[in-house]
Amino acid sequence: MHAWLCENPVGVDALVWKELPTPVPRAGEVLVEIKAASLNFPDLLIVQNKYQMKPPLPFVPGSEFSGIVQELGEGVTHLKPGQRVACLSGTGGFGTHAVVPAQACVLLPDGFAMVDAAAFIMTYATSHHALIDRAALRTGETVLVLGAAGGVGTAAIQIAKAVGARVIAAASTDDKCAMCASLGADATINYSTQNLRESLKALTGGKGPDVIYDPVGGDFAEPVFRSIAWRGRYLVVGFAAGPIPSLPLNLALLKGASIVGVFWGDYARREPASNAAMMVELARWYGEGKIKPVIDSTMPLAELKAAYAHMGTRGVKGKLVMVS
């Protein structure tokens, strides 16, 4: 097998394409031949030693991928060689093969495209857990999605629309805003040229959004939280802007609002039955055409460094997917 190996986490340029022994699955594991792998923001951080999870060196980056089961480890009974799966394993995806825990594999239904499957689990599970479980989003409520043109943002737009919410999508360019509108966003804000607070006031008749979905953090956090509706729910999804914001807690008191943390990975570990039911619903919505990953582009796995560079420009709309 071949894979991109990180021997020194000082950045993308240190990654090396290497031939490695094909691993043998141990008990509870499966060997997967990888067909497609997507880039997520943690994949950029992990090779810079900036991510909260720091795998032992050397490691193969790539947290989310799809492929075909090749071999089963002892005790694996729910999968068979030849079956198509999507996997979320933290590392291992940017290679031709990977050994992963069997419980990290989701069996793909017929008609689920490999490229879509590689760009599905992390973003859609995060957004569903955030909006449906943590925020208890209701039909008719208004959701503000920050970073709306990114992977989790585009998933959040589609999931919010699937349950009948009104969506305001905020993004950094007119082109990205147009793409969000094409996904069903009812209104858009270009926060590079428009004032967020004034725009939200105008778009909500002064009420503010009921739910704020924030994977960005940074300087946008406080202005949008000041705009939140009474009994609003502010979802802390991530910090793509870099700095972790500090919110004045008196604002939560004055608005009767909730600041809600969203950590889908630990939710899946702690509440596996609920997570499994969520994945079934997401797969059904995909089959019904209610949700579909937005793929910015597909690139050969050999061009991973160029894909990382593109992702680093923040010009990506949806997800980048590497194909073998």
Language-model segments: which ranges?
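NAD(P)H dinucleotide-binding glycine-rich loop of Rossmann-like/cofactor-binding domains
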Residues: A36, L45, R84-G147, S182
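Glycine-rich phosphate-binding loop and adjacent beta-alpha segment
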Residues: D219-I291, V316, V323-S324
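Short amphipathic alpha-helix with an adjacent loop that forms part of the alpha/beta core around
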Residues: N195-G206
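Glycine-rich beta-strand-centered segment in the early N-terminal region that forms part
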Residues: P21-S38, K50-G92
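Short, glycine/polar-rich helix-capping loops at beta-to-alpha or helix-loop-helix junctions
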Residues: G93-T96, A171-M179, I244-L249
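Mid-domain Rossmann-like dinucleotide-binding core that forms the NAD(H)/NADP(H) cofactor-binding site
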Residues: K80, A118-Q194
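Short glycine-centered segments of the SAM/dcSAM-binding site in methyltransferase folds
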Residues: R84, T142, R166, G232-R233, ...
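C-terminal capping/lid region of NAD(P)-dependent oxidoreductase domains
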Residues: M1, G206, A283, E288-T298, ...
